[in-house]
Amino acid sequence: MAKDLTKAAEWYWHAALNGSKAAQNALGDCYYYGKGREENSAQAVEWYRKAAEQGYAQAQYNLGYCYYIGEGIARSVSLAADWYHKAAEQGHSEAQAAFGDCYRTGEGVTKNEASAVWWYLKAAEQGHVGAQCALGDCYRTGEGVTKNGTVAIQWYRKAADQGYAEAQNMLGICYHNGDGVAQDNREAVKWCCKAAENGLALAQYNMGFFCEQGVGGANKEDALGWYCKAAEQENASAQYKLGVFYENGYGVTQNKEEAAKWYKKAADQGDENAKKAIDKMQSSGLGSAAAAAAALAGVGLVWKILKG
């Protein structure tokens, strides 16, 4: 396989030197991903640029992305937006969604929520799940468009049905809150669970909450496991919850040191509840040196318990 990739890169090289914009973009990919060529993001940018300047939409998007994240070239959100725009004008759905993001956040362009919606719609109509979810957000909150919960649900569902975790989670939250749809906790649990199983930390936290509260028939005994999954992905709210569980012995052997560790992780991310919990432990004489040391330790104990 390695020989095949190297050979492919050689053919791309020859074609790229002869001016093939598709080959130039492909060679850029070889350098960017380290396939058939040693990984070199600066070289990737140069080949993307050659293709982009010939009007190749995928290369224009790739170059915009490199500018946006500052990989292989100095970061410039304005140049990122310029290249996204060029590709978006050619109907490139990923670029249309990215350009919509620029307008929504005001990165590289003057913030304009209505323009963001316009570009999201272009991408969403081509089946771009991220843009569909973003449209759901815009209709739910009234960003750049008249607020309409029913339409928000329609866009969330389009993306959720394609397995997009963020949309699945939002659909679950809308069902839980009765926002744009009849309140239904079983549907809420179903959709948040799909998102959680797809690895979305926020949805994993939500599932922990649903399980803890017994929402929609969720199993209370599963709460700890979901909070652990979210906490491992640095979700501060889940880290705080693990602290609560360990401090009080909810579903796990009571362990003040482990509680202090998780509270500290959450507090380090700015979680106010965790900061208050640490203050309370210290004022109660529970913030011992041992607990402080445990707070700085690794995160293996929870998984050891869960795995047996």
Where are these regions (language model features)?
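TPR/TPR-like (Sel1-like) alpha-helical repeat modules
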Residues: 84, 227, 254-272, 279
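Short hydrophobic alpha-helical membrane-entry/anchor segments
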Residues: 284-288, 299-308
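Short helix-capping/linker turns of helical repeat alpha-solenoids
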Residues: 12, 17-20, 33-35, 40, ...
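Hydrophobic face of amphipathic alpha-helices that form TPR/SEL1-like repeat modules
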Residues: 1, 26-33, 37, 62-69, ...
